[in-house]
Amino acid sequence: MAEKFESLMNIHGFDLGSRYMDLKPLGCGGNGLVFSAVDNDCDKRVAIKKIVLTDPQSVKHALREIKIIRRLDHDNIVKVFEILGPSGSQLTDDVGSLTELNSVYIVQEYMETDLANVLEQGPLLEEHARLFMYQLLRGLKYIHSANVLHRDLKPANLFINTEDLVLKIGDFGLARIMDPHYSHKGHLSEGLVTKWYRSPRLLLSPNNYTKAIDMWAAGCIFAEMLTGKTLFAGAHELEQMQLILESIPVVHEEDRQELLSVIPVYIRNDMTEPHKPLTQLLPGISREALDFLEQILTFSPMDRLTAEEALSHPYMSIYSFPMDEPISSHPFHIEDEVDDILLMDETHSHIYNWERYHDCQFSEHDWPVHNNFDIDEVQLDPRALSDVTDEEEVQVDPRKYLDGDREKYLEDPAFDTNYSTEPCWQYSDHHENKYCDLECSHTCNYKTRSSSYLDNLVWRESEVNHYYEPKLIIDLSNWKEQSKEKSDKKGKSKCERNGLVKAQIALEEASQQLAGKEREKNQGFDFDSFIAGTIQLSSQHEPTDVVDKLNDLNSSVSQLELKSLISKSVSQEKQEKGMANLAQLEALYQSSWDSQFVSGGEDCFFINQFCEVRKDEQVEKENTYTSYLDKFFSRKEDTEMLETEPVEDGKLGERGHEEGFLNNSGEFLFNKQLESIGIPQFHSPVGSPLKSIQATLTPSAMKSSPQIPHQTYSSILKHLN
């Protein structure tokens, strides 16, 4: 486990110390690499996103993401637990400290899978798609109420827990703050949304868009859940716009004129009736779902439903409950965007000295008024209708001081006399962990009674009211049993389940090791591995010492072959002497062929039994050899011993008594036997069958090993005499 952890640390540069274990790569976020790990302090699996800070631009994006995700708190948004520095160090609330780091780690809630992986298995049932779409709109309503644009909505950024069918929006790496009371034209980044989920307005004006771009992406995702494939999958921006115009009607004339000035080839006089309407692209869906989708996928963002309006659509009536669809109580404003600029360039510090416009040259009717404020109380920004949008002319929004809550925005928490920086634990043995407040019965003071991480805003309220939605009631039989089984587990706090994740990991590793041992034990002969090993050995270069030994061995074989020829000539001379002795014994045994044995005084033996014994000894001798070379050198030693012994008649007889009718190769010389036992008609004419048998069994026809000299049976015949 330690080696695996260190290898991942070295490859991907994760430096979190020993607190986190069992790192597993999950993917890449909008601006960082994401891993899952188990927190040893609380025995909980979390997702960790690493953001590398290489230049001022990356620091700006990291600051923006951290600022947004720390303030967002919703049941359909992935929760963030901690922001860590290198080696798992805790970061201070000082904004400038972020510029001194080379990387930061965002520890957030771990989700089981994402919508992209689910859709790889095929389309969803319409009821499941409606449930997920409701949760997506519910999260978007909260995000947009906080004046935040996600700008990267796609199935891969929508995370799901399959056990309870909860969907959460994640990866705010490309999100940004957009105060609706100020114009952002010309100051928005281009090409952030994934191409397949870009709205027509974003394709025409990449740096001028509103919250409606998130709603277009949500509509494309809903259609993808119903069909299992991307609704508009263009290879480039021009093809993407072409696919949209084939299915989405262009109602307003000003939109058609704008298209005519950009892509006149694809523009017709009447574009209210598309060639391939959504009814053809989405066959089989209900009429209510089609009407719901047509009101979201509109060409003009002004005609498009907002998240709040979409939740009120009749198609969502089975889930919609406005009291259970909260909005942000502390939305972002223009000064939060200015903080990013101040951090990146200290030369803009004079922006703090902006003055209000006391006298406005525009009338009150020229300005859109927010519904929550009286027209007399709202400070009008003359820049909103101006073509000049320099950052230095940005008007600070005075609405933040209208309700008299000036202490909310004090830059130093010490100015608040009612605020205590000391942690107020409910219990003396309380542990300060960032995750336990989600599952344990007591709070860990996370996001409560503490100043904001980056913007130094001190909330007046002592406690943040976390909103918890009731469980969505839906009759989905596929998940009923699983919910019942896990009800007991959810009743326990995470602290009581401490050690469960580690024990599960250890059990998985033990089972994998056991399975590997079983495979090794039951593994048979692998022909492919044998061939691969043989090819590998044959391709290797042989050492010089081995080649020299092989050459010496070949020369030894040649010398033995020469000696065998000499031994063969000696054996032929002995054979001629044995033939002469056979002539004297023709009359001794007239019917020896019919008898079962040959008698020679006290020394008598069965011929067949003798042959079998000799063959068994030969086989036993060969079985004792461990290799071909052992057998070869054993034969060589036997040959040398035979050549050193003198060949005399007396000793030859003794040797014949021991070896009988067998030569050194264990073969029986039948032609000598036929002559010695005096078979009738043996001396018949040459054409007789026995003579032909004798001709086929002559010593020249009987092949034996060249390393072993032939033997004759003269000693045996002498013994019989």
Swiss-Prot record:
Requisite cofactors: Mg(2+)
Chain segments carrying region Disordered: 701-721
CC annotations in GO: cytoplasm; cytosol; nucleoplasm; nucleus; protein-containing complex; septin cytoskeleton
Regulation: Activated by phosphorylation at Ser-189.
Subcellular localization(s) per the UniProt record: Cytoplasm; Nucleus
Keyword Metal-binding: no
GO molecular function: ATP binding; MAP kinase activity; protein heterodimerization activity; protein kinase binding; protein serine kinase activity; protein serine/threonine kinase activity
Active site: D152 (proton acceptor)
SMART domains reported in the protein's UniProt record: S_TKc (SM00220)
Motif FRIEDE motif positions after renumbering to this chain: 332-337
GO biological process: intracellular signal transduction; positive regulation of dendritic spine development; protein phosphorylation; signal transduction
Enzyme Commission identifier(s): 2.7.11.24
Expression tissues: Highest expression in the skeletal muscle, followed by the brain. Also found in heart, placenta, lung, liver, pancreas, kidney and skin fibroblasts.
Extent of Polar residues compositional bias: 701-715
One Pfam entry name: Pkinase
Motif (SEG motif): 189-191
Subunit structure, as described in the record: Heterodimer with ERK4/MAPK4. Interacts with (via FRIEDE motif) MAPKAPK5. Interacts with UBE3A; this interaction may be indirect and mediated by HERC2, possibly via HERC2 interaction with NEURL4.
Family statement: Belongs to the protein kinase superfamily. CMGC Ser/Thr protein kinase family. MAP kinase subfamily.
Domain notes: In contrast to classical MAPKs, the TXY motif within the activation loop is replaced by the SEG motif, whose phosphorylation activates the MAP kinases.
Entry protein name: Mitogen-activated protein kinase 6
